[in-house]
Amino acid sequence: MTISKQLLRIAGVLSFAVAIFQAVISFVPSWSLYFGAPKELVSNATILIIAGLLATIVFVIFGLYALAGAGDVRILPLLRLGLLGIGGVYTLRGLLLIPQLLTMAGILQFNESFSSQMLASSLISLLIGLLYLAGSIVGWRELPSKNKN
């Protein structure tokens, strides 16, 4: 097993873990609020559940793309582009860590403070994004493809 497949497999497992976490907190408004959901969203349980389950579906799809890149499930459409895009989304979300750290250091000023949950979420997102990108770039030539692009 190559390093790129291992990286993508880990990224996929972590995406599934995020999906499970998202699904669980979607049914408990106080947990959703604790982990950063807007108060307006939390005040309507039906919308909270729908939004949470839609996010869960997205994270499951992300996980399936990682496993497809590792060769564990069938090839998905636009696999290479999808893996890079998913890695980019996670990494961009993770880069919110920079203003959080700058604010904590007193270099930047924001009206709202950053919670430890937001900091942890940024770190996790950055880690997962880098796993997707590293696995995709390192193993670009060995990624399964119906037609090598």
Predicted regions and their residues:
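Cytosolic juxtamembrane helix and N-cap/initiation of the first transmembrane helix
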Residues: M1-V18
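Hydrophobic cores of alpha-helical transmembrane segments in multi-pass inner/ER membrane proteins
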Residues: L53-F62, A120-G135
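Loop-to-transmembrane helix junctions at the membrane interface
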Residues: G69-G88
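Hydrophobic alpha-helical transmembrane segments of integral membrane proteins
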Residues: I86-L108
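Interfacial loop at the N-terminal end of multi-pass membrane proteins
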Residues: F21-L54, G69-V73, T103-E112
